[in-house]
Amino acid sequence: MNKVVNVSQATKISRELKNKGKSIVLAGGCFDLLHVGHIRFLKEAKKQGILFILLESDESIRKLKGKKRPIIPLEERVEILLSISYVDYVIPLKGIKNNNDYNELVSKVKPDFIAITKGDFAESLKEKQAKNVGAKIIETIRIKDKSSSKLTEIFRNYLK
């Protein structure tokens, strides 16, 4: 079974799993330069049910973090995430342009839970999305000094 799915496939799979009494969890992110904070986040999210990852596109990461990002291209980030036992499905977010696109995606998949990290820059958006579909928020603690951006900075300074 393919674990890399588009939105319509995720919607169908979500519906089928919910009909079998399973809970659906959405967790989004860039997951560029995977680190222990990511792993703990995914582990906590997985405790609530079947875990779907909304994986940001390379284009969206460049807009968010700068032209030198991502370090790891989308296809490789998909492969890395699928090697983690906590991850059930990955939805690569190609063509997502704005918050309305995210809202529509969440309303189609209809998760029971949306996982966020404390201090998530999109926390209020995700809380609204959760409210709109009747989902609960799973909030995990951000691990200080553990981020892909920090790792990128360390590597760039090391390589100077």
Task: Place the predicted regions along the sequence by residue.
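Nucleotidyltransferase catalytic core that binds NTPs
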Residues: M1-K160
